[in-house]
Amino acid sequence: MVQGEESSWRMERAALPLNQALAYGVQAHAAAAAAPPTCFLDFQPAAASAAYFGFGELEEALIHGGGAASAGGGVDPGVIIKNDVAQAKSAAGYLAGAGTGRPPTLEIFPSWPMRHQQQLHSGNSQSVGSTGTDSSSAQNTMSQMELVSPASSAPRQEVMMVTTDDYSYKPGLAAAPAAAAPPSFQQHHPLPLQLHGGEGGGDHDKRKHGSTRKDGKLVDAKTERRLAQNREAARKSRLRKKAYVQQLETSRIRLQQVEHELQRARSQGLFVGGCSAAGDMSSGAAMFDMEYARWLDDDTKRLAELRGGLQAHLLDGNLGLIVEECMQHYDELFQLKAALARSDVFHLLTGSWATPAERCFFWMGGFRPSELLKILIPQLDPLTEQQLLGICNLQQSSEQAEEALAQGLHQLHQSLADTVAAGTLNDGAAAPNYMNIMAVALEKLASLENFYQQADNLRHQTLHQMRRILTTRQAARCFLSIGEYYSRLRALSNLWASRPRDNFIGTESLSPTATELQALHHQQQNQFAGF
């Protein structure tokens, strides 16, 4: 056992560099000269150096020293003892330096702050200089020397190097040497991690309550919360900005659609009373035109859904939802027209909000219900006898209501014409009863709104009656046929408005067709010249 320890100690000393050995030797001789030992048991080295120097080695050194003295003519035993003490203290200095991973003579650029280095050197000097003078302390130190071995000092060196170089707390590395070393050794020789207990605990608390940024700076918990709040606020701001941009884009598209509808209305030459529609149009009428343009866009989308549902052979439940949406869509149109009738009924009766081809088939500001039923019956085949009977009864009742409304409107027109033509027309506004005539005419015009409301209610009820009579798929084909019919009328109006307008009068080169038309026109004038 003594020979193994001696061989390990000699291997450790052989591994030391020359300058380190000299440095430790000088320190050891200075300490020995300052306090010469009085007996053999008084010069026990520190506990840290006891791992590499034992009683067996001292005895062997004394024996060899005594033999050499007798053989060589006398060597002073005190010199041998002082040399052994110097070697033991140099081993203690080496162990203290090995704990830090770098010897003191080479610590030019330390890898940790200077205050940690000073604490480490002060701790090592205290451990080296604190040697007991009584026998009990010598025995305790001797027992600690026997417990420590080079194999147990290696984990200490690894733990010390990891803690000081990384400057962080590693629970896994610190637990290994603490478990391996006995309690007595831990009491006299605290682990290197405990030397940095003040600073290491602070760093551990900072890491517990904060985090480290990418640039290596430590951020406390309060700053981290503020940074998180700033990131969340920036994310919400980006979402609001995105929604605002989408709203602006939607408004821009809507404005383009309104401008397109107004341009289309002007190109169709809508005139009321010999003036432009834009000049005499009220605010309610302009708002209705914009809402009707939006309604047409939605109607096109719903027609596409109906067509897709019929082609995909959807179930009656899914197809019925689309049909109900179409019915609600028409209800919305009737509500818009009723709101405008209370403010500007003439705008609805003249049909200036519709295309020219649609106005040709208008009856009191809209479609004639009986005529619409005649168009829809061939599109709804096959129909059962009960369905056909219900549609015929609906058509007959619609015709009777239309006739009654037409007669009432005709009587209103006749009464209004008689009221306006009352009195003398040659005097103009200077007539004595002019204001009375205008007041009576205004009262009769107020009843014109009632006629229009009754006609619109008839159209609305006809659509709801058709929905009750027909099945789900028949109702889908019904709404699809109505939408396609008026879509073709609008397309016809656009084609008529975009047709080429040729001037047949005053042209130098006339086509044969134009020449024939002019010749026919002259013949007709000569034929009816006598009339």
From Swiss-Prot:
Residue numbers spanned by region Basic motif: 222-242
Gene3D superfamilies xrefs: 1.20.5.170
Keywords, comma-separated and alphabetical: Activator, DNA-binding, Nucleus, Transcription, Transcription regulation
Residues of the bZIP domain: 220-264
Keyword Transcription regulation among UniProt keywords: yes
Any one GO cellular component localisation term in the record: nucleus
Pfam name, any one: DOG1
GO biological process: DNA-templated transcription; positive regulation of leaf development
Annotated region (Leucine-zipper), positions in chain: 248-262
Tissue expression from the record: Expression in meristem/developing ligule regions.
Main subcellular location: nucleus
InterPro entries: bZIP, bZIP_sf, TGA_domain
GO molecular function: DNA-binding transcription factor activity; sequence-specific DNA binding
Disulfide bridge positions per record: none
Span(s) of short sequence motif Nuclear localization signal: 224-231
Sequence intervals crossing the membrane: none
Oligomeric and partner information: Binds DNA as a dimer.
Role: Required for the formation of the blade-sheath boundary in leaves. Promotes flowering.
Family matches, as PANTHER family: TRANSCRIPTION FACTOR TGA9
Protein name: Transcription factor LG2
The organism of origin for this protein: Zea mays (Maize)
Gene: LG2
